[in-house]
């Protein structure tokens, strides 16, 4: 079953329907669903297609494999091409007679074994641009390599008609994988497996959240136990530095200086390099407060990939214990309480941010906001700095939001206390929003926005 990605499918079909040659670049981190998106689109399209997954082998082997697919698709004996340029030229020429989709998946593998492949493609694209009906899709997981194809100095510069950087699904699309679970459990599952389709399709609806976590990530030999380290090893040469940074981030250290102090990374410039790489890999994000966006000192770094966060928070540091303990005893001692009282509520804040953005994009707010994020303030009473996690800004001013993932309903005294706390920081809000897992016991008013959990998952 294929879930979500409606926007990306729409863009791909729009490209395929054009009566001219079109070149597309699709990239994103491993396991994010690039190949499945393309295959699903090909299945739904009526246009003839050649899908080839490039291999980490010599050019001759790739030519032989692609030639075999070509022979099968066009129902003639396998053609004997001398090289990849000849093979691709045949397909481009074929597309002068008919619409044809050509997909080169895992393109960086082919690029490694064929010198000057980008230039070869450029020559073919230019040669057939006015006569072919080729829909050429280049796809790959090595983000730096794929982004380099868009650079000004690359031969393909200016020839890509459609670029799709596939990102993790949001909480709503991810929940499509969690059929049969309550809304509360959907938040819990998302807090572990995030928006990566490959992880989410492993969730077993016949088992509890706890059982899924233990079987997939928190037990010796679990299906995803080595997933995080494998991804890092495929992209980063010095894995030790990445592990150090992840451990510091998982403990809650988010400021550059604190990360440097907590980790054993040798220097500031080295830490900058590691963080930049992790950000490009889509596993770490850098956030600036919306009221001080240009102040580098107030930048915060956070693990954005939920599986990586869970792994480094609970598994990585306790892996020796996990390997010799009963899985349920280990879960109860090192995961259960912190997961429910701290981890899930923190991820729930991110879910709420995503929900607000979804509403904003749909035009559901009378005043659409232009900024959303953390708000930095100086607490003069307690002589310390602080942050509010969810604040939006629109033409009328700021709106503050408080997200609570707790068993009890949000009450009137709680709301009044929080509003008083916000006013004490001199944050001038014209509305106050509250988002609750367990509903509300309070009065409504024009300056309040009350959102319950079921609204977040409503169609």
Where are these regions (language model features)?
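Phosphate-binding site recognition
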Residues: 1-333
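A cross-kingdom feature that marks ATP-driven nucleic-acid transaction machinery
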Residues: 299-459
């Amino acid at each position: 079953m294929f879930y979500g990605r409606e926007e990306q499918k729409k863009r791909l079909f729009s490209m395929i329907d054009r009566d001219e040659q079109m070149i597309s670049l699709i990239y994103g981190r491993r396991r994010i669903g690039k190949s499945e998106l393309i295959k699903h689109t090909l299945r739904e399209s009526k246009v003839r297609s050649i899908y080839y997954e490039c291999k980490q082998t010599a050019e001759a082997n790739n030519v032989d494999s692609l030639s075999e697919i070509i022979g099968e698709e066009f129902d003639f004996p396998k053609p004997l091409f001398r090289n990849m340029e000849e093979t691709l030229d045949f397909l481009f020429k074929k597309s002068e007679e008919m619409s044809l989709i050509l997909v080169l998946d895992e393109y960086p593998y082919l690029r490694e074994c064929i010198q000057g492949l980008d230039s070869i493609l450029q020559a073919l694209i230019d040669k057939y641009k006015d006569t072919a009906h080729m829909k050429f899709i280049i796809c790959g997981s090595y983000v730096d390599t794929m982004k380099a194809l868009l650079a000004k100095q690359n031969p393909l510069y200016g020839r890509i008609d459609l670029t799709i950087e596939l990102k993790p699904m949001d909480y709503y699309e991810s929940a499509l994988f969690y059929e049969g679970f309550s809304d509360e459990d959907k938040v819990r599952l998302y807090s572990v497996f995030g928006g990566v389709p490959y992880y989410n399709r492993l969730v077993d609806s016949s088992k509890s959240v706890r059982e899924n976590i233990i079987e997939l990530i928190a037990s010796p030999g679990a299906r995803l136990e080595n997933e995080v380290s494998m991804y890092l090893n495929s992209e980063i040469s010095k894995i030790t530095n990445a592990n150090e940074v992840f451990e510091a981030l998982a403990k809650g250290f988010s400021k550059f200086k604190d990360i440097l102090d907590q980790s054993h990374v040798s220097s500031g410039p080295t830490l900058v390099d590691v963080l930049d790489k992790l950000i490009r890999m889509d596993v770490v994000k850098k956030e600036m407060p919306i009221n001080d966006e240009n102040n580098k000192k107030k930048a915060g770094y956070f693990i954005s990939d939920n599986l990586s966060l869970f792994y480094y928070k609970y598994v990585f540091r306790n892996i020796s214990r996990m390997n010799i303990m009963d899985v349920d005893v280990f879960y109860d001692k090192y995961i259960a309480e912190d997961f429910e009282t701290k981890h899930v509520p923190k991820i729930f804040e991110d879910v709420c941010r995503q929900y607000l953005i979804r509403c904003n994009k749909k035009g559901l707010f009378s005043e659409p906001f232009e900024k959303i994020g953390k708000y930095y303030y100086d607490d003069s009473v307690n002589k310390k700095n602080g942050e509010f996690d969810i604040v939006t800004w629109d033409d009328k001013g700021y709106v503050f939001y408080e997200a609570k993932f707790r068993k009890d309903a949000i009450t009137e005294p709680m709301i009044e206390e929080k509003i008083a706390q916000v006013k004490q920081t001199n944050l001038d809000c014209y509305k106050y929003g509250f988002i609750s897992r367990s509903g509300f016991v309070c009065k409504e008013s024009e300056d309040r926005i009350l959102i319950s959990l079921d609204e977040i998952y409503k169609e």
